[in-house]
Amino acid sequence: MAVPRANTSKARTRRRRAVNMRLEAPHLVECGNCGNFVQSHRVCGRCGFYRGRQVINPDDLC
């Protein structure tokens, strides 16, 4: 006769999920204008440059 499977505890379930749902650190590159680290394909928050030209005024950010 078949034996019922044991219940999976909350800790075991959460430990298994934690491995697969791990957050990765964002990929940072150095800004070509000021040297600040920013995410790829984003405007630099310190100087306002993106792809070699200024797209926003950094004084307007604050």
Swiss-Prot record:
InterPro entries membership: Ribosomal_bL32 (IPR002677), Ribosomal_bL32_bact (IPR044957), Ribosomal_zn-bd (IPR011332)
Gene Ontology MF terms in the entry: structural constituent of ribosome
One Pfam family per UniProt: Ribosomal_L32p
Cytoplasm is among the record's keywords: no
Family of the protein in this entry: Belongs to the bacterial ribosomal protein bL32 family.
Keyword tags: Ribonucleoprotein, Ribosomal protein
Name the record gives this protein: Large ribosomal subunit protein bL32
High-level lineage: Bacteria, Pseudomonadati, Spirochaetota, Spirochaetia, Spirochaetales
CC per GO annotation: large ribosomal subunit
GO biological process, alphabetically ordered: translation
The keyword Protein biosynthesis is assigned to this record: no
PANTHER family in alphabetical order: 50S RIBOSOMAL PROTEIN L32, LARGE RIBOSOMAL SUBUNIT PROTEIN BL32
Naturally occurring in which organism (per UniProt): Treponema pallidum (strain Nichols)
